[in-house]
């Protein structure tokens, strides 16, 4: 059973390792700069604790996935969704998205959004299955010479006062 917990200071190496392992199979399809940015090192993960929440998915106490978020005005940015290759297609990404969306809804954000690359068609399918739609294609010059997609989802049931 997948359990998702909030990441805490001290989880930086675990998160960095999960991200690297998840994206390593795509290293040759990324530009060097894009891969370096995507496969965030522990020191950069440490900085993210001040920027927004992070979660770790575990099976039997073993970390198998991670995701983080960045609160903005009306939108909540999803970044660094990463699932260990050996655990992919097991509902972990789905569970992480559910936890993240619940957090964003409870915080009264109106939308979730993310960027993904064309080299990750499985990620795009997961996001579309969860109600995300493509806002626009992002040109290569916008992100480390890699084209991609900006995707968004309206969060239902957000009550504004």
Predicted segments with their positions:
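A short beta-loop-alpha structural element at the N-terminal edge
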Residues: 3-17
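Hydrophobic adenine-recognition pocket in adenosine-nucleotide-binding enzymes
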Residues: 7, 81-83, 116
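Conserved GNAT-fold acetyl-CoA-binding loop/helix
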Residues: 17-45
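A short helix-loop-beta-strand connector motif used in the catalytic cores of GNAT acetyltransferases and
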Residues: 44-56, 77
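C-terminal "cap" of GNAT-fold acetyltransferases
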Residues: 46, 110-161
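Conserved beta-strand in the GNAT
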Residues: 56, 62-70, 77-82
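Conserved acetyl-CoA-binding loop-helix of GNAT-fold acetyltransferases
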Residues: 83, 89-102, 128-129
């Amino acid at each position: 059973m997948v359990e998702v917990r909030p990441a805490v200071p001290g989880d930086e190496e675990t998160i960095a390792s999960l991200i690297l392992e998840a994206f390593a199979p795509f290293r040759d399809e990324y530009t060097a700069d894009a891969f370096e940015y995507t496969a965030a090192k522990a020191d950069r993960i440490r900085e993210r604790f001040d920027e927004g929440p992070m979660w770790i998915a575990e099976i039997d106490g073993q970390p198998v996935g991670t995701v983080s978020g960045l609160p903005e005005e009306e939108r909540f940015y999803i970044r660094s969704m990463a699932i260990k290759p050996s655990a992919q297609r097991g509902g972990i990404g789905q569970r992480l998205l559910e936890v993240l969306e619940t957090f964003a809804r409870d915080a009264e954000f109106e939308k979730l959004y993310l960027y993904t690359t064309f080299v990750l068609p499985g990620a795009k399918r997961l996001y579309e299955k969860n109600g995300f739609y493509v806002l626009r294609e992002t040109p290569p010059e916008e992100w480390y010479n890699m084209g991609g997609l900006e995707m968004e989802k309206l969060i239902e049931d957000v009550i504004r006062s």
